Amino acid sequence: NYIYSGHNYHQ
């Protein structure tokens, strides 16, 4: 799943 942190996406 993807998590949006501030201005970056993490898989």
From Swiss-Prot:
UniProt entry keywords in alphabetical sequence: Heparin-binding, Lyase
GO molecular function, one term: lyase activity
Activity versus pH, per record: Optimum pH is 7.2.
Top-tier EC class: lyase
Organism, scientific name: Bacteroides stercoris
Complexes and interactors: Monomer.
The enzyme's E.C. designation: 4.2.2.-
Function: Degrades acharan sulfate and, to a lesser extent, heparin and heparan sulfate.
UniProt keyword annotation of Lyase present: yes
Temperature note: Optimum temperature 45 degrees Celsius.
Regulation: Inhibited by Cu(2+) ion, nitrogen and cobalt. Activated by reducing agents, such as DL-dithiothreitol and 2-mercaptoethanol.
Post-translational modification note: The N-terminus is blocked.
Name the UniProt record assigns to this protein: Acharan sulfate lyase 1
